[in-house]
């Protein structure tokens, strides 16, 4: 269950996209990815001008440097994400075993338990 779209597919099909970090343990933030040279020419200036650039943004960006590193032949980001999904599925199974209903059958690390 889940999507069969790879990161390479997204990069091939999009001019720009973002990758969130909090669900894989990052303190906060998203990494914005531009797939073609020149698309990011004024991005930094626009972010700064609109007040969306954090003073410690470089420090926060280091999280992604670590998350996008290799560990045992795969991206650390993917390994952590897969582990989070596996644990969420176990939590969902535990709720079902106790008689709770889930709003949807989620293939992600977000589970929506009905607590009525």
Language-model-derived ranges and their functions:
Residues 2-108, 115:
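Active-site C-terminal subdomain of aminotransferase-like
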